[in-house]
Amino acid sequence: MLVFQTKLQKYQLATLISSVISNFLIFFATITPAWQVADDLDADRYVQSGLWLYCPGQAQCWYIFSDSLINYYEKVDVCRFFLIGDCRKKLLRTPYFFGWHYAVLILNVISMICMSLCAAAVIFSYVKPARSRISVIMLDVFAGFASLLLCVSLIVFMVNAEMLESKYLIGIKNTYEKEYGYSYYLAGLAFVISVITVLFAALVSTYTFLFPEEVADSEYTLKMSNNQFAVRYNNDLPQPYQPPMSQLSMQIPSTEHGSYIAGAISPRGDFKSQTRHFYSY
């Protein structure tokens, strides 16, 4: 049975909740395509570009991981005057996928794995208070590493999203600026909650290593809760029928013809007849 009476147990619960929420947000942000969005007025469509999904308006979305086989550039004949041979390139149309999308995707996946291990570590530290020190150390490592990777992921995305070739959507006639979509803001919210998770994990470590009485109290309350649950479970089990003592000891008074031997009643309430023989007279 779950109990959260001590401060250590409450901080463990807060760490678990924040890690689960952060992991869910970054997972939802990763699988959705709205990291960069733009209105293509030439084609009258709302384009969403994600880390692995591309949704061109009302058309069906498709997943892509590499655009290396598609040539989006053409060389310009006019080169710079002072830099002979340094010919600029002209972007024909906006690529669906850049290499840094793949890097951000990998960082997000590793961050989700670390956050899941963080949740597992805090659960183990709650269930086994006597062996919680190793799990608390792992909790701090996984929580901090997940938050750091998510921060690096967002920085990589923001820096590359502001580049000229990925900031604008080249339409049929005009060029339209891309904006950040809800997926990006969900990832940012996940990072904020991951930082809160790191703070809660630090509090769990503080109470585990500096306040051993909190660990002892947590172990005691958890053990008492389990004992009470076992007693309550045993009381709820169906009990066998027990007839009253007055029914078991009921006797019929003697008559003028002799004494009457009453039938015996078993503990289950079944009637047992007794046979009279010549020794009874």
Swiss-Prot record:
**Where does the protein end up?**
Membrane
* Gene3D superfamilies associated with the record: 1.20.140.150
**Family matches, as Pfam families:** Clc-like
According to Swiss-Prot or TrEMBL, what is its membrane topology? Multi-pass membrane protein
Q: Where does the source fall among the domains of life?
A: Eukaryota
- The transmembrane segments are 13-33, 104-124, 137-157, 184-204
The UniProt keywords, alphabetically, are: Membrane, Transmembrane, Transmembrane helix
Can you name a GO cellular component term? plasma membrane
**Is Membrane among the key words of this record?**
yes
Q: Say if the entry is tagged with keyword Membrane.
A: yes
Q: In which family does this protein belong, per the annotation?
A: Belongs to the Clc family.
Query: What protein name applies here?
Result: Clc-like protein 5
The opening ranks of the lineage are: Eukaryota, Metazoa, Ecdysozoa, Nematoda, Chromadorea
